[in-house]
Structure formats: C-alpha cells, structure tokens
C-alpha cells in the first residue's frame, strides 16, 4: 500500500506554470476506504493509491491537500486546489458548479445502518447523513427527517447515541464499521443506487487537466490496474 506524507509532492513532470508546477489534489481524509489519514499523519486509501498512479501516468507533479467535505467544492472553485478526489459521486446538481472526469468507480450501493434489533421507518424516521452528500438529498426526497453532520464519523455517533434511527452512506464505508461494531450495528432495509459513480471534480475552466486525467483513468481501466485497486480496497463493482 502506497502512503505519502501530508502535502508530499509526487515525482513527475509539471503540467504548466498555470498550476504552479504542481497539481493540488483535494481530499477529505476522513472517508475510508476511499481516503483517510493514518496515525503517522499519512494519507491512505483507495483514492490516494489511485491519485498517485493517475499523476504518474499523466506525467504530472501532484501534492495532496486536506479539506473538510462541507467546503470542498467552494474551495476548489476558489483555487485552493485543482482537483477533488474524495469519494464524490457524479450528479447533475454538482455538474452545474464543476466538471467531472469519467467515473473511476461504478455507482456504489448506499445502505442504511441502525442499532441491531431496531425497527426503522425509512419514510418517516430520523435518518443521519453527511452534509452535502447524495445520500442527504435522497433522505429529503424520501420524506424522512434528515439530520446532517459535517463528518461521516458523526453520522455513526448519531445512531449510537439515539439522535438518529439510522444512517445512510456508501456501503463500502459502512461495511468495516458494521463488522467492527461487535454486533452493535447492523444493515437494515434495501440497498439504494444513487448517482453515476465517483469521479474527480475539476474546475470548468481546466478542461486540459480533465482531459489528462480522463486519459489516465481510461488507461487504468483498459489494463486492469483500476480493477486491481478496487479489489484491494473492497470498493465495489469492477469495470
């Protein structure tokens, strides 16, 4: 597993002076197995390994930047970094603000998790979700009461402390939490498919950068490298 220090620069060729010699990769660092930070302060996860390989294939110098989820799109548009690679599903609403690369994951089923033995009404109950996610929008449309939190860990805590009847999130995120809960938490209800898979967020003005990453993603799909990473990190369906 590749690991890099926070803000460590990858080797490669710079794209152009337009990106100050590096492409800054914005990520949350709080949504394993997609992206996280270990006890040594190093970025880890599926998207970190993926991003490193994409930068290598695109001959780009890249550096990682941590940013909270609730401001991750505004800060991309403000120029704080050049891409978002943070488990962000491609949706029509988000595409009004930013561009996306081609998807690097298939749509991941969303699942509900509740305290084991709990009865949950998905149409009128209280459901926790992370702010600004496709799951939060889905809860609103379902008629249930949405309670939003800035971080995914807070959504789990809301179920444990009784503030929410259940949490909805990507199955790949919830799987290890349920397994490690010692029977305290369980999946409930049916899976829900939302969004068009996950892609890299790019400013609308940076079409050249998007093209470079699209070519790199497609090359990883073609040679099986992307599927290998998806299997390694247990992300979901293969291409």
PLM region spans:
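Sec/Tat signal peptide C-region and signal peptidase I cleavage site
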Residues: 13-22
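Extracytoplasmic small-molecule ligand-binding "clamshell" domains
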Residues: 21-88
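Periplasmic-binding protein-like
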Residues: 29, 106-111, 175, 179-218, ...
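Short helix-initiation/N-cap motifs at beta->coil->alpha
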Residues: 48, 64-74, 131-132, 147-161, ...
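Alpha-to-beta junction loops
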Residues: 59-61, 77-86, 160-169, 173, ...
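Ligand-binding clefts/hinges and TM-proximal coupling segments of bilobed small-molecule sensing domains
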Residues: 61, 67, 134, 138-154, ...
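A ligand-binding cleft/hinge motif common to bilobed small-molecule-binding domains
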Residues: 71, 88-97, 165-194
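Flexible hinge/capping segments at coil-to-helix
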Residues: 109, 113-128
